[in-house]
């Protein structure tokens, strides 16, 4: 009987210690979670200059430039990630972003090369598929392929509501 009491008591203590440890680890993770919202582009550039292989920060900075349509600042960061990152998801995303920037500069063939390489690395990349679908849907010779790609993209449960609505709007304009 005492074995069972000791065993039960030991298990209870173990569960309490485990719970406390998990709580402490969660608090520590929250403490060290990096929030870049209050970090300036200049500060990020400085950190990246000193630590060129800090790919997540480099990607965050490139995305800021991309969102501001400052492609000349975004491109070197995406290129660095595409050439140096071992993370296929980051590499694929960087290539897709490069592909879109190249498309925006009216170089369709090079743009589709980057997007196809992005998809070769990560065949599930919604960004690369979306960009390729948008490019193809505007080309009368590839419009059906573009429609097919975009229709497959909107089926994904990983797509944000805003992105889904944007793609649905494009499809509605071209399916008329």
Regions found by a protein language model. Give the residues of each.
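Terminal, low-structured helical/coil segments at or just beyond the last alpha-helical repeat
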Residues: 4-18, 144-176
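Canonical positions in the second alpha-helix
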Residues: 46-47, 81, 117-118, 152-153
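TPR alpha-solenoid repeat register
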Residues: 57, 91-94, 128, 163
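Canonical tetratricopeptide repeat
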Residues: 60, 94-97, 131, 166-170
């Amino acid at each position: 009987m005492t074995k069972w009491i000791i065993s039960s008591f030991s298990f209870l203590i173990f569960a309490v210690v485990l719970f406390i440890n998990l709580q402490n680890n969660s608090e520590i993770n929250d403490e060290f979670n990096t929030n870049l919202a209050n970090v300036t582009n200049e500060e990020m550039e400085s950190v990246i200059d000193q630590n060129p292989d800090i790919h997540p920060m480099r990607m965050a900075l490139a995305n800021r430039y991309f969102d501001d349509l400052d492609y000349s600042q975004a491109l070197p960061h995406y290129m660095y990630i595409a050439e140096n990152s071992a993370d296929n998801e980051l590499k694929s995303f960087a290539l897709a972003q490069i592909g879109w920037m190249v498309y925006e500069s009216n170089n369709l063939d090079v743009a589709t090369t980057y997007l196809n390489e992005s998809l070769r690395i990560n065949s599930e990349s919604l960004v690369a598929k979306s960009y390729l679908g948008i490019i193809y849907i505007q080309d009368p010779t590839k419009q059906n392929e573009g429609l097919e790609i975009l229709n497959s993209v909107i089926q994904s449960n990983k797509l944000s509501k805003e992105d889904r609505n944007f793609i649905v709007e494009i499809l509605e304009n071209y399916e008329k």
